UniProtKB/Swiss-Prot annotation:
GO biological process: proteolysis
Residues annotated for a divalent metal cation binding in this entry: 30
PTM per Swiss-Prot/TrEMBL: Specific enzymatic cleavages yield mature proteins. The capsid assembly seems to be regulated by polyprotein processing. The protease VP4 cleaves itself off the polyprotein, thus releasing pre-VP2 and VP3 within the infected cell. During capsid assembly, the C-terminus of pre-VP2 is further processed by VP4, giving rise to VP2, the external capsid protein and three small peptides that all stay closely associated with the capsid.
Location of region: Disordered: 837-857, 968-1012
Functional summary from the UniProt entry: Capsid protein VP2 self assembles to form an icosahedral capsid with a T=13 symmetry, about 70 nm in diameter, and consisting of 260 VP2 trimers. The capsid encapsulates the genomic dsRNA. VP2 is also involved in attachment and entry into the host cell by interacting with host ITGA4/ITGB1. The precursor of VP2 plays an important role in capsid assembly. First, pre-VP2 and VP2 oligomers assemble to form a procapsid. Then, the pre-VP2 intermediates may be processed into VP2 proteins by proteolytic cleavage mediated by VP4 to obtain the mature virion. The final capsid is composed of pentamers and hexamers but VP2 has a natural tendency to assemble into all-pentameric structures. Therefore pre-VP2 may be required to allow formation of the hexameric structures.
Annotated site, Cleavage, chain positions: 441-442, 487-488, 494-495, 501-502, 512-513, 755-756
Domain spans labelled Peptidase S50: 513-755
Enzyme class, spelled out: hydrolase
Chain residue ranges for the region called Interaction with VP1 protein: 1003-1012
Name of the molecule in the record: Structural polyprotein
GO molecular function, one term: structural molecule activity
A GO CC term attached to the entry: T=13 icosahedral viral capsid
Length: 1012
């Protein structure tokens, strides 16, 4: 398969490009091996809305070339008018000879408003029609929705601000390269001559019987009589040719005919006009043959063609009014659309209609088209091309997925936000190793897993790290696991019932896990077992490609089991971990067939189904239980597995059964593990703990149990039972168990995660952890702090958080972050990530809770205003309202807590007089009378200001009173005897005095005094 080097992802690039074209092009993995280059071409258009606010965008989502679609605006007469063609940014025929379309997506939306418009109005209808454009019978805004009955091919009433996305899905996989109509070297008399090489592959041919002994009769008219001989629907956006012949017969002498062919566009206008006969004279009494052959190149087709029409003009040489003109015609013609039957060339079409958009608004069309292109000889000199890779697994997987696209929710037209939300789901579909959690939430998981089992190599998909092993064995997963599978710390049994709990010494163990997981050097040492090299391990879960059952809201306790395969001395082994669930009751219907019918009795006589019948289970239970293998846990639901797992035994299972019997959890979040294997040999270190931890972590679960319980069982399993009592009544005497005894109605239980730690286990650290656990059981605040620490340590962000505390010593940033952090399932999170991935939506508060929150909110607001008597209890007694004006006045005047529901109206209407001081009145009078430095206000003005203060009960003047005081001040200033005399105003019209004697400016005049 593709990308086998990546052990965590196994992407099929072709289907990823089909479902998400913006991720780029990918070679089609079929057997058409041509050297090509991959190219992604964008298309971006800003279309102006017409006067009616309505329009239509026609897309050809599967057309292999530069043509993307066309835009039409709706006129006031109800007809569409062609606006422009929509093409890719680059003219592909200018540089490339051949093309194959890989994928295409286009988005239509509007986010701009013309001047004077303040609201973004308008809606969009979109439909993918599995036919040609000419076959549409109703192209109105509402009529488009009747073009198809498939709900996945149409959407209606999408706001133009949100927009729609058109996704091109292939209609066929037998695709060859198409000639693009590229120019070819040619020399002619006309320097503007153009010669192109068009596609001849899969032409579409329309055969039309133009006339079959058609009889025409009319009287002479000046200019001739025009008649439409035929009109037929055709579809063309590329070059076409028209060939045929007509035969005319007449008995009238001097009859002249002219014939014209019209190619008509979608809007009803003639796009191309060609005369096939002009003033051809007909000979009476004989067959007059009129052959014609037309070729229309692609560059002359400026808009989509949807029909063809042939008109005949009849006239008579030297005719007089009333002369008879009659003739008969027969013949046929053929219209050949070059490449018209290529898959996706003319059908299907996607139509996007918008309505009630503001005139002058801009509708944006943006998208991407991915191609396989073969360059022309000139470009090939500088462009490296490569062969495509034939991958039948990827091709079959793509075909099977798209064949079930209606069941998998894969549409051709989407609301843009919904398409964005589905991108993570599409990534799961394209990744063969994805756990399909989002697909499981939508209910598509069973279908996709069944398709994976059919389409791709089973072992490579289900157990990626074992892909080389699977290729070496050459067998399926059923044989790989088989009945000879065995488990440590939960041992699977063979069909014969013999225990296969022991294996040979492991010399080399390759563990596919993160750092911090322990590797077992010598797992078991028992005689009569061969030495095995090259054990391959993985922390994942062995998965079978089977349909899953889902048990919703089932209370359960989960526990991991380590499984190893045993074939023979020459076959490599595989080590993996599987998760099991303990469910209350007899539920053999949930078990795989390999586990049914096997049970073990407990000390109290009850049965545990799914266990190997090996003696008596050393537990006292109050009811029957069933052990089932699971594949996933999602939204508090258990995804059951149908893998052929034999019955099991083991300490972790015993602990899980005892835990289930005591606590009976309501949701499956508990994972029990002892950390000790069920083996008949000595163990050097904690065996299989890391593999179990990885399995629990992959499901996002915590482990509850001693984890690193240090035991030395020796060869006797009963010795371990004595040292580790499984009787639930003895659990309160086991200080090393992280299983707090809580009542059944306590809801979700919290357990310290026994996960792989970044800290190295030491005796001192273990003592400190036990001390903290003991303190947590006593102090709830310390338990909360410890849970935060364990959360930081489990997710590996202890160091990051320590660095963050240095930059935020007072926790201001952290407090603001927590206060403003959006919650899962909130409106902002759904808008960003969609509804996929979230479990149960957050429950809204009850009316009582909402009322209490409101009371608390009002109380806090009053407290910020200095009103401390309005406690939440007082607000609740006051009718869930804050203090009234009367209550506030009462509290301000008396400093006593007002009675709830008492309005104290006397304190509202009876104003308490507050006298202003003489200094305050003098300061106000001085300020009103004049600026500082002027004369002091007279006593009469001060008395006027004092009257205003008295009227206002100690408050200053309002605006009207201020105007009156200013006028009074002006009058008093004019009649004040102490005010300065006014300066005389110069007369503006007084003539200036001229110097006597007309002397110069610098000559001094001589007076009589000077002469004396």
């Amino acid at each position: 398969m593709t990308n086998l080097q990546d052990q965590t992802q196994q992407i099929v690039p072709f289907i990823r490009s089909l479902l998400m074209p913006t991720t780029g092009p990918a070679s089609i993995p079929d057997d058409t091996l041509e050297k090509h280059t991959l190219r992604s071409e964008t298309s971006t258009y800003n279309l102006t809305v017409g006067d009616t606010g309505s329009g239509l965008i026609v897309f050809f989502p599967g057309f292999p070339g530069s043509i993307v679609g066309a835009h039409y605006t709706l006129q006031s007469n109800g007809n569409y008018k062609f606006d422009q063609m929509l093409l890719t940014a680059q003219n592909l025929p200018a540089s490339y000879n051949y093309c194959r379309l890989v994928s295409r997506s286009l988005t239509v939306r509007s986010s701009t408003l013309p001047g004077g418009v303040y609201a973004l109005n308008g809606t969009i209808n979109a439909v993918t029609f599995q036919g040609s454009l000419s076959e549409l019978t109703d192209v109105s805004y509402n009529g488009l929705m009747s073009a198809t009955a498939n709900i996945n091919d149409k959407i209606g009433n999408v706001l133009v601000g949100e927009g729609v996305t058109v996704l091109s899905l292939p209609t066929s996989y037998d695709l060859g390269y198409v000639r693009l109509g590229d120019p070819i070297p040619a020399i002619g008399l006309d320097p503007k001559m153009v010669a192109t090489c068009d596609s001849s592959d899969r032409p579409r041919v329309y055969t039309i019987t133009a006339a079959d002994d058609y009889q025409f009769s009319s009287q002479y008219q000046p200019g001739g009589v025009t008649i439409t001989l035929f009109s037929a629907n055709i579809d063309a956006i590329t070059s076409l040719s028209i060939g045929g012949e007509l035969v005319f017969q007449t008995s009238v002498q001097g009859l002249v005919l002219g014939a014209t062919i019209y190619l008509i566009g979608f809007d009803g206008t003639a796009v191309i006009t060609r005369a096939v006969a002009a003033d051809n004279g007909l000979t009476a009494g004989t067959d007059n043959l009129m052959p014609f052959n037309l070729v229309i190149p692609t560059n002359e087709i400026t808009q989509p063609i949807t029909s063809i029409k042939l008109e005949i003009v009849t006239s008579k040489s030297g005719g007089q009014a009333g002369d008879q003109m009659s003739w008969s015609a027969s013949g046929s013609l053929a219209v050949t659309i070059h490449g018209g039957n290529y898959p996706g060339a003319l059908r299907p079409v996607t139509l996007v209609a918008y309505e009630r958009v503001a005139t002058g608004s801009v509708v944006t069309v943006a998208g991407v088209s991915n191609f396989e292109l073969i360059p022309n000889p000139e470009l090939a000199k500088n462009l490296v091309t490569e062969y495509g890779r034939f991958d039948p697994g990827a091709m079959n997987y793509t075909k099977l997925i798209l064949s079930e696209r209606d069941r998998l929710g894969i549409k051709t037209v989407w609301p843009t936000r919904e398409y964005t939300d589905f991108r993570e789901y599409f990534m799961e579909v394209a990744d063969l190793n994805s756990p399909l959690k989002i697909a499981g939430a939508f209910g598509f998981k069973d279908i996709i897993r069944a398709i994976r089992r059919i389409a791709v190599p089973v072992v490579s998909t289900l157990f990626p790290p074992a892909a080389p092993l699977a290729h070496a064995i050459g067998e399926g997963v059923d044989y790989l696991l088989g009945d000879e599978a065995q488990a440590a710390s939960g041992t699977a049994r063979a069909a014969s019932g013999k225990a296969r709990a022991a294996s040979g010494r492991i010399r080399q163990l390759t563990l596919a896990a993160d750092k911090g997981y322990e590797v077992v050097a010598n797992l078991f040492q028992v005689p009569q077992n061969p030495v095995v090299d090259g054990i391959l391990a993985s922390p994942g879960v062995l998965r079978g490609a089977h349909n899953l059952d889902c048990v919703l809201r089932e209370g359960a306790t989960l526990f991991p089991v380590v499984i190893t395969t045993v074939e023979d001395a020459m076959t490599p082994k595989a080590l993996n971990s599987k998760m099991f669930a303990v469910i209350e009751g007899v539920r053999e219907d949930l078990q795989p067939p390999s586990q049914r019918g096997s049970f073990i009795r407990t000390l109290s006589g009850h049965r545990v189904y799914g266990y190997a019948p090996d003696g008596v289970l050393p537990l006292e239970t109050g009811r029957d239980y069933t052990v089932v293998p699971i594949d996933d846990v999602w939204d508090d639901s258990i995804m059951l597995s149908k893998d052929p797992i034999p019955p099991i035994v083991g300490n972790s299972g015993n602990l899980a059964i005892a835990y289930m019997d005591v606590f009976r959890p309501k949701v499956p979040i508990h994972v029990a593990m002892t950390g000790a294997p069920n083996a008949c040999g000595e163990i050097e270190k904690i065996s299989f703990r890391s593999t179990k931890l990885a399995t629990a972590h992959r499901l996002g679960l915590k482990l509850a149990g001693p984890g690193a319980f240090d035991v030395n069982t020796g060869p006797n399993w009963a010795t371990f039972i004595k040292r580790f009592p499984h009787n639930p009544r003895d659990w309160d005497r086991l200080p090393y168990l992280n299983l707090p005894y809580l009542p059944p109605n306590a809801g979700r239980q919290y357990h310290l995660a026994m996960a792989a730690s970044e800290f190295k286990d030491t005796p001192e650290l273990e003592s400190a952890v036990r001390a903290m656990e003991a303190a947590a059981n006593v102090d709830s605040l310390f338990q909360s702090a410890l849970s935060v620490f364990m959360w930081l340590e489990e997710n590996g962000i202890v160091t990051d958080m320590a660095n963050f505390t240095l930059s935020d010593p007072n926790a201001h940033r952290m407090r603001n972050f927590l206060a403003n952090a959006p919650q899962a399932g909130s409106k902002s999170q759904r808008a960003k990530y969609g509804t996929a991935g979230y479990g149960v939506e957050a429950r809204g508060p009850t009316p009582e809770e909402a009322q209490r929150k409101k009371d608390t909110r009002i109380s806090k607001k009053m407290e910020t205003m200095g009103i401390y008597f309005a406690t939440p209890e007082w607000v609740a007694l006051n009718g869930h309202r804050g203090p009234s004006p009367g209550q506030l006045k009462y509290w301000q005047n008396t400093r006593e807590i007002p009675d709830p529901n008492e309005d104290y109206l006397d304190y509202v209407h009876a104003e308490k007089s507050r006298l202003a001081s003489d200094e305050q009145i003098l300061r106000a009078a001085t300020s009103i009378y004049g600026a500082p430095g002027q004369a002091e206000p007279p006593q009469a003005f001060i008395d006027e200001v004092a009257k205003v203060y008295e009227i206002n009960h100690g408050r200053g003047p309002n605006q009207e009173q201020m105007k009156d005081l200013l006028l009074t001040a002006m009058e008093m200033k004019h009649r004040n005897p102490r005010r300065a005399p006014p300066k005389p105003k110069p007369k503006p019209n007084a003539p200036t005095q001229r110097p006597p004697g007309r002397l110069g400016r610098w000559i001094r005049t001589v007076s009589d005094e000077d002469l004396e």
